[in-house]
């Protein structure tokens, strides 16, 4: 408990001190801030103008520092750190290209996903080398174990990449991604502690909770900084890999239900648009806008209302998971 407290306050205080200076630095470097989509909600062109991205850099520094100081650098923790940093690098390049071109499109989606899958597959293969014979087995819920066999490696890679991009899609409103990530890390860390999977994984989760809470202080509406792709892609990958390490990938889908809903809304929107355009010559939409948080914005829900209601849903689903499915 003392160690967990040290990790939490080290990450939170470090981030809380660094963010104001980092925000000032980013505003000097990029006066226009993160490029905003003109086709998005009209309010974003005003409320999110000149807000700098790349807050994920401080999240990573603040979270990894106490991990290096207080946690044991087991193979699992080292793999978590490496995968997180690889995805952070990819996100940084994407953010940099957006700022350089002053356009909301950075790296192409195909390029990002290809690189993500390569990194994730390598990471899972490394994990397989030093894991026990039960490596391919995962827990669905109470007493139900599934053995994926040879399919486990691509499945685990899919979880990591899917989680990374799901957090990225969710990061569209002030505080939305941060609140969802905090909930996911809290309950995955709790599962790791309850099942005694690895106390160091619990400390890893606590470190990120502290760092993201310090970020949330400056990211609540109206946000002073965004986490950017450097933050969302890396934090999402860390969540996905954490669920893989504690063998609770299926439960993570319920704990991170908002991430799943956000991703499905985009898939449904794009698929239905392409289908109707092919069949009728004109594309139609299921939602007013996707991801689904923008749909509710179009229905004139305020950002704070959407964020809080989504947070309530994720907490309820997480408590249900711990109570009835673990």
From Swiss-Prot:
Its cofactor is Mg(2+). It is an enzyme of class 2 (transferase). Its EC number is 2.7.8.13. The chain crosses the membrane at residues 2-22, 51-71, 73-93, 113-133, 143-163, 175-195, 199-219, 225-245, 250-270, 305-325. It catalyses: UDP-N-acetyl-alpha-D-muramoyl-L-alanyl-gamma-D-glutamyl-meso-2,6-diaminopimeloyl-D-alanyl-D-alanine + di-trans,octa-cis-undecaprenyl phosphate = di-trans,octa-cis-undecaprenyl diphospho-N-acetyl-alpha-D-muramoyl-L-alanyl-D-glutamyl-meso-2,6-diaminopimeloyl-D-alanyl-D-alanine + UMP. It is found in: Cell membrane. Keywords: Cell cycle, Cell division, Cell membrane, Cell shape, Cell wall biogenesis/degradation, Magnesium, Membrane, Metal-binding, Peptidoglycan synthesis, Transferase, Transmembrane, Transmembrane helix. GO terms for biological process: cell division; cell wall organization; peptidoglycan biosynthetic process; regulation of cell shape. It is a multi-pass membrane protein. GO terms for molecular function: metal ion binding; phospho-N-acetylmuramoyl-pentapeptide-transferase activity; UDP-N-acetylmuramoyl-L-alanyl-D-glutamyl-meso-2,6-diaminopimelyl-D-alanyl-D-alanine:undecaprenyl-phosphate transferase activity. Pfam families: Glycos_transf_4. GO terms for cellular component: plasma membrane. Pathway: Cell wall biogenesis; peptidoglycan biosynthesis. InterPro entries: Glycosyl_transferase_4, PNAcMuramoyl-5peptid_Trfase, PNAcMuramoyl-5peptid_Trfase_CS. Belongs to the glycosyltransferase 4 family. MraY subfamily. PANTHER family: PHOSPHO-N-ACETYLMURAMOYL-PENTAPEPTIDE-TRANSFERASE, PHOSPHO-N-ACETYLMURAMOYL-PENTAPEPTIDE-TRANSFERASE HOMOLOG. Catalyzes the initial step of the lipid cycle reactions in the biosynthesis of the cell wall peptidoglycan: transfers peptidoglycan precursor phospho-MurNAc-pentapeptide from UDP-MurNAc-pentapeptide onto the lipid carrier undecaprenyl phosphate, yielding undecaprenyl-pyrophosphoryl-MurNAc-pentapeptide, known as lipid I. This is Phospho-N-acetylmuramoyl-pentapeptide-transferase. It comes from Wolbachia pipientis wMel. The lineage of its organism: Bacteria, Pseudomonadati, Pseudomonadota, Alphaproteobacteria, Rickettsiales.
């Amino acid at each position: 408990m003392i160690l967990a407290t040290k990790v939490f306050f080290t990450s939170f205080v470090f981030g809380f001190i660094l963010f104001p200076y980092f925000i000032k630095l980013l505003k000097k470097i990029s006066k226009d801030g993160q490029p905003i989509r003109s086709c998005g909600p009209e309010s974003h062109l005003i409320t999110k103008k000149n807000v700098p991205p790349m807050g994920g850099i401080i999240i990573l520094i603040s979270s990894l520092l106490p991990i290096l100081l207080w946690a044991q650098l087991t193979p699992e923790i080292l793999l978590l750190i490496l995968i997180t940093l690889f995805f952070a690098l990819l996100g940084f390049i994407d953010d940099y290209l957006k700022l350089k071109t002053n356009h909301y499109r950075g790296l192409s989606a195909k390029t990002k996903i290809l690189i993500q899958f390569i990194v994730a597959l390598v990471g899972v293969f490394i994990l397989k080398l030093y894991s026990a014979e039960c490596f391919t087995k995962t827990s669905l819920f109470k007493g139900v174990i599934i053995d994926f066999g040879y399919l486990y490696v691509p499945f685990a890679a899919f979880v990591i990449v899917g989680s990374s991009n799901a957090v990225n899609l969710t990061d569209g409103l002030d505080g939305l991604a941060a609140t969802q990530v905090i909930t996911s890390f809290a309950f995955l860390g709790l599962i790791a502690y309850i099942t005694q999977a690895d106390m160091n994984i619990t400390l890893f989760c606590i470190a990120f909770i502290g760092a993201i809470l310090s970020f949330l202080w400056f990211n609540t509406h109206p946000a002073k900084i965004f986490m950017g792709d450097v933050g969302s892609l890396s934090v999402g990958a860390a969540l996905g890999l954490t669920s893989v390490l504690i063998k609770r990938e299926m439960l993570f889908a319920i704990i991170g239900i908002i991430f799943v809903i956000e991703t499905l809304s985009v898939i449904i929107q794009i698929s239905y648009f392409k289908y109707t355009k092919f069949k009728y010559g004109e594309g139609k939409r299921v939602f007013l806008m996707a991801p689904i948080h923008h749909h509710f914005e179009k229905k004139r829900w305020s950002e704070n209302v959407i964020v809080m209601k989504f947070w309530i849903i994720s907490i309820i689903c997480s408590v249900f998971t711990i109570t009835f499915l673990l």
